[in-house]
Design a protein with these regions (language model features):
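Bacterial Sec-dependent N-terminal signal peptides
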Residues: 1-20
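Conserved catalytic or regulatory cores that recognize and/or transform ribose-phosphate-containing ligands
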Residues: 18-179
Length: 179
């Protein structure tokens, strides 16, 4: 009987530890609508794969946090998909991003220098009044002035680097209520 209890306790502890770690959900995987963890959308420069993979760097820095990251950067992106609503792969991507943005408690927007990021600008505008945004827009982003002014107007948290955002995010996640 003691052995059975020991095994049961080990299983419970293991499950508890696993549930206390970072979970990364990439498009097009299913979104966890009923999970109580803080959910963070990694929005920002991808530019059809031309931008640095800043998302993986952020994932590594948050590996010990009990949160969920929604990463729209696809490992299987196909440049031949047409950006039209009739293309089922493209539609699935856009619908995944919209659902993930809505589900997120925090939305990170990173506008990389020398990138254009038109979809990120669209999503930034959609959520400017939401109080969910944390923004990094360093010198060199082609519309930095627009981003700066919108952040000022709507009192959006803005950082000069991803490193500063990560530190602020870690502090915010400590204080974020679990719904």
């Amino acid at each position: 009987m003691t052995r059975v209890l020991s095994i049961l306790l080990l299983v419970l502890v293991t499950n508890s530890i696993q549930s206390q770690s970072l979970q990364i959900i990439k498009s097009p995987n299913a979104l966890p609508f009923n999970d109580k963890k803080v959910k963070i959308f990694l929005g920002g420069s991808i530019d059809m794969g031309k931008a640095d993979n800043w998302q993986s760097n952020l994932e590594a820095q948050l590996k010990n946090k009990n949160i969920i990251l929604f990463n729209p950067r696809r490992d299987d992106w196909n440049k031949d998909w047409k950006p039209i609503s009739a293309d089922s792969n493209f539609r699935k991507q856009v619908e995944w991003e919209l659902a993930a943005l809505e589900l997120s408690d925090i939305i990170i927007m990173y506008f990389a220098p020398n990138s254009q990021s038109p979809i990120s600008l669209l999503e930034f505008g959609m959520y400017a009044k939401s109080k969910k945004l944390m923004v990094v827009c360093p010198e060199g982003f082609w519309r930095k002035g627009n981003v700066d002014i919108v952040c000022e107007r709507y009192n959006i948290e803005m950082y000069n680097s991803l490193e500063l955002l990560v530190e602020a995010l870690k502090n915010r996640v400590k204080q974020e209520p679990i719904f």
